[in-house]
Amino acid sequence: MECQLCPHHCRIAEGKTGLCRSRRNDGGVLVSEVYAKPCSLAIDPIEKKPLYHFHPGTTCLSLACTGCNFRCQNCQNHEISQASLADVDHYELSPSEVVSLCRKHHCPGIAYTYTEPLTYLEYIIDTARLAHEAGLWNILVTAGYVCQEPLKDLLPYLDAANVDLKSFSDDIYKRVSGGHLQPVLDTILAMKQAGVWVEITNLVIPGVNDDMQMVRQMCRWLVDNGLAEAPLHFSRFFPRYKMQDIPPTPLHTLKAARQVAEEEGILHVYLGNV
């Protein structure tokens, strides 16, 4: 059967999982392997997401399940994003228990983060609905690679998101992450149109996506689509996972990217991992 969650449209045989390792064909029905089974829980400052213009100075309960529908060669959380549920320790935590845990630790919101939360969409929606009923925020930290119909089911419960816009080149997306650019742009626009507070992160990798003309095109697209006020975070790359042979991003490259963004009309530009 074919999964309709993301643009990969995986054809999944009986008893098998798709590319994300978290959705299984069980008798012709797609089920989430990781529903209510988070592998990571933490209390983080909201700025760590990073979200700089959404209730700064507050904390959030961060939650992640295993799996991702990208294969980023530079993934900093590959131990869990590229793992199956059986590969890692995990908790048993229902949506109501997540909300109770959040309130117990006096966090005003929940962040679905660290891996690709959209691969466990059902768990997020059920948790996010209860979170809203309890007066809590819902925050998504995502690469944004999802089909628009399932995304619509989540948007009413989403308050803020940081979208990892990995480059402004479809070729780089295919080469580095195994996906495509346009669905990510569609996700950003859908979030904006739904009234979700959006911030953008762009990890600048030397020799991969550090061409300033491409950075300019990305910033121009953001401005042209009404996102000039969306904070843009240029993040510094460090060697990791399958990109151990690439040096850290020079600070002058990040500063050049910031200058380009400001020239194009981005109002809030930040440098991360510096």
Residue ranges and their predicted role:
Residues 1-65, 78-82:
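N-terminal [4Fe-4S]-dependent radical SAM core
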Residues 4, 66, 70-73, 129, ...:
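Core alpha-helical elements of the protein kinase catalytic domain
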Residues 9-42, 216-218, 222-274:
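A broadly conserved sequence feature marking short terminus-proximal activation segments
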Residues 16, 68, 169:
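A generic "binding-loop/recognition-motif" signal
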Residues 60-62, 66, 70-108:
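Glycine-rich active-site/cofactor-binding loop and its immediate structural neighborhood
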Residues 95-249:
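Conserved AdoMet/S-adenosylmethionine-binding subsite of the radical SAM
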